A protein has these predicted regions:
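Short extracytoplasmic/periplasmic juxtamembrane "stem" segments immediately C-terminal to an N-terminal membrane anchor
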Residues: 43-64
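Folded interaction domains in cell-surface recognition and envelope-stress signaling
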Residues: 131-134, 143-148, 152-193, 197
Length: 235
């Protein structure tokens, strides 16, 4: 009887421990989900200052890696190869993005954005969403939003399709066409085409920038607008 009672007590203790472990795991998941939601909400709040400017039509240049292309018939062509999760790409965009926008809107240069996805699944989702925004004529502002909320940790779970749709809505892209395009991954073939074309153009990392076919290299650790601007103007 004593042995049976002891065995019963051991079983009871074991189930209590299992239940406690399960509770800790479930609680951790719940807090993790709520924590991620809070972080997402806080990040999206940083988009409050980004409002859609007039739409700018782009095309997909399949001869140049399925780049999102703004062809203005200008003498200068700039190719930008980037991955949306790349922190150095954010540095480049923070320094030179507004200047590139003005070149496009004022038709002073042709600009091709090659959106890559080699940093992981979230890069694929962000690139797909970027192509979807381009279909709406709103790539430039969505591009700005991407870097405004870029996570400091790659593949952190931040860039879900839902978050990318919410990003679009936050800056004014509210069409069901955009939402469907993002959630269905409608542009992943174009995303893959960009990645497949890297070797053809000698691209080994991001950001990589070409001005009239010549690779541009910064001379300082930081990206300096005046340096990039001078290189563009020199052609």
């Amino acid at each position: 009887m004593a042995k049976q009672a002891a065995k019963s007590a051991d079983n009871t203790t074991r189930w209590i421990v299992v239940a406690m472990v399960a509770l800790v795991v479930v609680t951790g998941i719940v807090f993790s989900l709520f924590g991620q939601t809070d972080k997402t909400t806080a990040s999206l709040a940083s988009l409050d200052g980004i409002k859609l400017k007039p739409a700018v039509t782009s095309t997909i240049d399949t001869a140049n890696g399925s780049a999102i292309t703004f062809d203005n018939g200008a003498a200068t062509t700039i190719d930008v190869w980037e991955d949306s999760q790349c922190p150095v790409c954010k540095m480049f965009a923070d320094a030179n993005g507004q200047y590139l926008d003005s070149l496009i809107r004022e038709k002073k240069a042709n600009v091709r954005y090659h959106i890559l996805s080699f940093l992981g699944d979230e890069s694929v989702r962000a690139a797909n969403a970027s192509f979807c925004a381009a279909d709406e004529g709103q790539y430039l502002d969505f591009h700005k939003a991407i870097y405004a909320v870029q996570s400091t940790v790659e593949n952190s779970g931040f860039w879900s399709n839902q978050t990318l749709v919410e990003m679009g809505k936050k800056i004014g892209i509210t069409s069901t066409k955009f939402e469907d395009c993002v959630t269905k991954g409608s542009k992943v073939d174009l995303v893959q085409a960009n990645s497949d074309s890297m070797s053809k153009f000698g691209v080994q990392g991001t950001p990589t920038v070409f001005i009239n076919g010549k690779k541009w290299e910064r001379t300082q650790n930081a990206f300096v607008l005046d340096e990039f601007k001078a290189a563009v103007e020199a052609g």
